[in-house]
Amino acid sequence: MTEEIVSADIETNTPRGSKLRPFFGFYGGKWRDAAKYYPSPDHGLIVEPFAGSAGYALRYAHKRVVLCEVDPIIAGVWEYLVEVSPREILAIPDVPAGGTVDDLGLTQEAAWLIGFWVNRGVSRPRKRPSKWMRDRISPGSFWGNRVRQTISSQVERIRHWKIYNCSWNECPVTGSATWFVDPPYQKTGRHYVYGSEEIDFKDLGKWCRTRKGQVIVCENHGAGWIPFRRLADVKTTRAGKRAVEAIWTNNGDIQ
């Protein structure tokens, strides 16, 4: 790690405002559900130790945010987003008909970003547009002018975010924060390159219990590595499918 973040209860000078929209889609992302079901942060720093598409942090982007992500591709996309200019985003063209992301001649990180927009709700960037994108179904959900405009209008608002390509147990934050812990789920999280089979959930449960501040942990209903309670029946990224979500919080009793 290049730094250790000890104290967290300081907000940035970044203007408050409405929530940010997702910078990219990701399998299991929580952006839609974050405002409906999960507690609001009560600390000046939000930490997502399994960052993915950072759906929770996007709802409170004016706060200090630390994203930890073990997958170098996901971490690379976030590192690109916190540095890229709006003009650079607007200059990225559409994928040509019958073509792939490789035809755009982009930097690796930019290609990864677009790869998440040509096929939504995946755990890895794709190169060829999905049939939904090719058929122009819901164009605002795939790479094109509307998405370019959205991302370019938001990148300046995450300049203060910190990104770490590291595992949850290597997170540099040691002080109080709002911890939004959304790991690959124990029974269903094998769709990821760095999936649930690589996680020691007993250790993760102990780690969650010893974080300072507010701790929010996500899982499927029925998981037992921490005493979860049923949260909600939610829509998934798979057409017509729903899932029963569970939650554990420390109720602010760790200070």
Q: What are these regions, as identified by a protein language model?
A:
Residues 34-39, 152, 201-208:
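Short amphipathic alpha-helical segments and helix-helix/interface helices
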Residues 51, 72, 170, 185, ...:
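Short, glycine/acidic-enriched loop or turn micro-motifs at the edges of active sites
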Residues 47, 62-68, 176-179, 224-237:
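Active-site regions of enzymes building and remodeling cell-envelope glycoconjugates
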Residues 50-55, 149-150, 217-223:
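Short, polar loop motifs at secondary-structure junctions
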Residues 1-60:
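S-adenosyl-L-methionine
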Residues 162-197:
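Active-site segment flanking the S-adenosylmethionine/decSAM binding pocket
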Residues 193-255:
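Long, positively charged, glycine-interspersed low-complexity recognition regions
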Residues 7, 63-163, 169:
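Class I S-adenosyl-L-methionine-dependent methyltransferase module
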